[in-house]
C-alpha cells in the first residue's frame, strides 16, 4: 500500500493508487514507458501482456463481454459452460496478469495491498461460479487504472513540458570571431552566444550587445515581454522577440534556472504533503481492516443467521472490490502535483507539498525592504539648486563629478540628470564623504552632509531641507564650492510599482504585513508608509530579524518571511514559510527559502496563499468523495443487493472523479504562454 518514494532529485515524485510512479521527468527522459504498462497493475513498470496497454485492455473487454453473453444466451450445458469459463479466464489473463503478480508479491511480503484485494475478489468470484462477472470486473478495473494513469500524466506533462522548451543548439562565437552552431550542452560558461529574433535562449546568460523584448513566461510566469539590454540577465528557454542579442553564458546545460526549477519541483514532489502522509497511514490500516470485515461477512452470517454460504461469500467478495482505496490513495498526490505545477507555471517555485498546504495557515508576513518592497537600487528622485545658484550649471557640474565616481549614489545622480559632460581636473575621491575636482576651472565638491558640515557650509535652512528629505527615506548629496552650497540631490530606493497592491492583497487575505530592514528607522517608516505597511522595524541585524520573526509567530501565529539577501537567510529558514525573491536573490536566500518567486513579484505571495487554500479545499473534497462513495456501497454490499458490477463502477467512478477534481488546480492559475 505504501507508494514508492523516488530517490534523489531525478526520480518519480508520487504514486498512483496501485503504487505506479507518476514520473515528472520530461518525456525524453522518462523512467517508465506508460504505453507498455498494464493498466491493471503492472506496478513494477514492466508489461505483463502480449500487447501494449490499450489494445490489450480493449481485447480483454471484448472477451469479457463474450463470456457474459455466453452465460446469458447460450444453453446451460457443460460444453458451453466450459467455453464461457475459458473466455472469462482469457479476459482475466489479458487484463489482470500484472495485478495477480503484484498481489502475490504483496501477500508474500505480508501486505494487503489493492492488488491483493482485487486478486482475491476476482479469484473467489470465479470459483463460486460468477466467472462472467469476475472477467468483467477485472477488465473494467484495468480500464479504470489505465484512464487514471493517463489523467494523472497531465500533471506530469505540464511541468515536464517546460524542459522541452530549451533548444538543443546554440549559435556560439568562435575564437576567430565567426558564428558556429553547436550543441547547447557543449557551450562552456563564458562563451558568447547569439540569439536571433524568434529564437529561444539556449542557456542562462548576461546580454553583452543588442536590445530586445524577451518572453520569459516559461520561467517567471510574466505574461508581458520584458525589455532586455546590455547587462541584463536572460534565462534559458525564454524567447527573443524583437532584436538580435549577444550574451555571455553564465550557466551550462543542466545548471540553468529552468533546470533548477524542474529539479526542485521533482525533489519537492518526492516528499509527502501532510494530508498525503495521513492518507497513506490511514490506507495502511484501512485495507487489512476491510479484509478482516469481508472475511467476517463470508463466515459469520452463515454460522449465526443461516445465510447460504455462496451468498455470504459473494457479498464478501463484492465488499473487497468496493474496499479498494484507489480513489482515496490517488486523491492526494494528483492534487498536490497539480497545485505545485500550477504554481511553477506562474513562476512560483514551491519546494514541496508540505509548504503548499501550510501556506494557507499564514497569519503574518515579514518583508525585507531592499529588493523586496523596493527596487533595490538608488534612483535620483528630487534635486534643487540652492542659494540662488544657476540650475543648468549646477546640474551639469554635479553630473560631471558623479560620472567619475563608482559609488552607487553617484551613479544614480549621473543616471538621473540630463547632462553635457564637462571635463574634470584634479578629480579625487574623499573616502566616506564624497568626491572633489575642478569643473571649468572651479573647485567643487559633491558629498554628504558630513563633508558640508566639516567645511562649515551648513545653515538652519539647509538643515531643515535635509531633515525633510531624510524623513522621506532619502539620501541627500550636496554640491558645493569653497563658499556655499550650490545644489541638493536626493536619492532613494524607490518602492516597486506593485508593492502597495501586493500588501493590500495580503491584508485582504487576513495576513498582517510587517517590514524588517537594516536601514535606519526613519527610512523604514517612509518606505512602509508608501507600501501601506503599518508596522515597520529598522536598524535590524540578521539576528534581530530572526528574533522579530519568532516574536511575530508568538503574536500572530504562522508567519512567513520574504527576502532576497544573505542577511535574510536565517529568518527565511526560521519562518513557517520562507519566500525568496528569485530573480534578484542570492543563492543562499533561495536555498534557505521554502518558496522562490522567480520574477520578484510580491503579489505572488498572495497567489501562493490562495492556491494553498484552494488545494486544501480540493484535497478534502476528494477525500470526502472517496470515503462517502465507499460508505454508501459498503451499506449496499452488506445489507442490500450490490453486485460486483456496481462495486467496480463505484471504485472506477470515484477514482476518475478525484483525479478530474485534482487536475482542476492546473486551471487555478492561467497557464503560461508557450511559444510555438
Locate the predicted segments by residue:
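Small-residue-enriched core segments of transmembrane alpha-helices in multipass membrane transport
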Residues: 89-92, 142, 285-286, 313-331, ...
Amino acid at each position: 500500500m505504501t507508494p514508492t518514494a523516488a530517490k534523489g532529485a531525478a526520480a518519480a515524485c508520487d504514486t498512483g493508487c496501485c503504487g505506479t510512479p507518476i514520473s515528472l521527468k520530461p518525456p525524453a527522459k522518462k523512467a517508465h514507458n506508460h504505453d507498455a504498462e498494464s493498466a491493471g497493475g503492472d506496478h513494477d513498470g514492466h508489461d505483463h501482456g502480449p500487447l501494449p496497454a490499450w489494445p490489450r485492455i480493449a481485447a480483454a473487454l471484448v472477451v469479457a463481454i463474450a463470456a457474459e453473453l455466453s452465460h446469458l444466451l447460450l444453453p446451460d450445458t457443460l460444453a458451453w459452460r466450459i467455453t464461457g469459463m475459458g473466455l472469462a479466464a482469457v479476459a482475466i489473463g489479458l487484463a489482470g496478469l500484472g495485478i495477480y503478480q503484484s498481489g502475490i508479491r504483496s501477500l508474500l511480503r505480508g501486505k494487503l495491498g489493492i492488488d491483493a484485494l482485487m486478486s482475491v475478489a476476482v479469484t473467489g468470484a470465479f470459483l463460486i461460479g460468477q466467472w462472467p462477472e469476475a472477467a468483467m470486473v477485472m477488465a473494467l478495473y484495468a480500464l479504470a487504472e489505465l484512464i487514471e494513469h493517463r489523467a494523472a500524466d497531465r500533471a506530469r506533462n505540464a511541468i515536464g513540458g517546460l524542459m522541452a522548451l530549451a533548444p538543443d543548439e546554440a549559435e556560439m562565437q568562435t575564437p576567430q570571431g565567426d558564428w558556429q552552431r553547436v550543441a547547447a550542452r557543449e557551450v562552456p560558461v563564458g562563451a558568447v552566444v547569439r540569439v536571433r529574433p524568434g529564437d529561444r535562449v539556449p542557456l542562462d546568460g548576461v546580454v553583452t550587445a543588442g536590445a530586445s523584448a524577451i518572453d520569459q513566461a516559461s520561467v517567471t510566469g510574466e505574461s508581458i515581454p520584458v525589455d532586455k539590454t546590455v547587462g541584463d540577465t536572460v534565462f534559458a528557454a525564454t524567447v527573443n522577440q524583437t532584436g538580435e542579442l549577444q550574451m555571455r553564458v553564465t550557466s551550462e546545460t543542466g545548471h540553468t534556472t529552468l533546470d533548477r526549477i524542474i529539479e526542485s519541483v521533482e525533489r519537492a514532489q518526492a516528499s509527502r504533503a501532510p494530508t498525503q502522509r495521513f492518507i497513506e497511514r490511514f490506507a495502511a490500516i484501512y485495507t487489512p481492516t476491510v479484509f478482516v470485515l469481508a472475511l467476517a461477512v463470508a463466515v459469520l452470517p452463515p454460522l449465526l443467521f443461516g445465510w447460504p454460504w455462496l451468498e455470504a461469500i459473494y457479498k464478501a467478495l463484492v465488499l473487497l472490490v468496493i474496499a479498494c482505496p484507489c480513489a482515496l490513495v490517488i486523491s492526494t498526490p494528483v492534487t498536490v502535483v497539480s497545485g505545485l505545477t500550477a504554481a511553477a507555471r506562474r513562476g512560483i517555485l514551491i519546494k514541496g507539498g508540505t509548504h503548499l498546504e501550510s501556506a494557507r495557515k499564514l497569519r503574518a508576513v515579514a518583508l525585507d525592504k531592499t529588493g523586496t518592497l523596493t527596487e533595490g537600487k538608488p534612483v535620483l528622485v528630487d534635486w534643487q539648486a540652492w542659494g540662488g545658484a544657476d540650475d543648468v550649471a549646477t546640474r551639469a557640474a554635479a553630473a560631471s563629478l558623479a560620472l567619475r565616481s563608482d559609488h552607487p549614489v553617484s551613479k544614480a545622480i549621473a543616471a538621473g540628470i540630463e547632462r553635457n559632460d564637462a571635463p574634470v581636473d584634479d578629480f579625487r575621491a574623499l573616502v566616506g564623504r564624497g568626491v572633489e575636482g575642478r569643473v571649468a576651472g572651479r573647485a567643487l565638491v559633491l558629498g554628504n552632509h558630513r563633508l558640508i558640515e566639516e567645511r562649515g557650509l551648513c545653515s538652519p535652512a539647509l538643515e531643515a531641507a535635509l531633515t525633510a528629505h531624510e524623513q522621506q527615506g532619502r539620501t541627500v548629496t550636496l554640491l558645493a564650492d569653497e563658499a556655499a552650497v550650490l545644489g541638493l540631490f536626493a536619492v532613494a530606493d524607490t518602492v516597486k510599482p506593485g508593492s502597495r497592491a501586493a500588501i493590500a492583497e495580503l491584508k485582504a487575505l487576513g495576513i498582517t504585513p510587517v517590514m524588517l530592514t537594516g536601514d535606519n528607522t526613519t527610512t523604514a517608516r517612509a518606505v512602509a508608509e508608501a507600501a501601506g505597511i503599518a508596522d515597520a522595524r529598522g536598524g535590524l541585524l540578521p539576528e534581530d530579524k530572526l528574533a522579530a520573526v519568532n516574536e511575530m509567530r508568538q503574536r500572530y501565529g504562522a508567519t512567513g518571511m520574504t527576502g532576497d539577501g544573505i542577511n535574510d537567510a536565517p529568518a527565511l529558514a526560521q519562518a513557517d514559510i520562507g519566500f525568496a525573491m528569485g530573480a534578484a536573490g542570492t543563492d543562499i536566500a533561495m536555498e534557505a527559502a521554502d518558496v522562490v518567486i522567480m520574477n520578484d513579484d510580491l503579489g505572488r505571495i498572495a497567489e501562493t496563499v490562495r492556491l494553498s487554500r484552494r488545494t486544501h479545499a480540493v484535497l478534502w473534497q476528494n477525500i470526502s468523495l472517496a470515503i462517502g462513495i465507499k460508505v454508501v456501497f459498503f451499506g449496499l454490499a452488506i445489507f442490500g443487493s450490490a453486485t460486483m458490477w456496481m462495486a467496480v463502477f463505484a471504485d472506477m467512478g470515484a477514482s476518475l472523479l478525484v483525479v478530474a477534481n485534482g487536475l482542476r488546480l492546473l486551471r487555478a492559475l492561467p497557464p503560461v504562454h508557450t511559444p510555438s
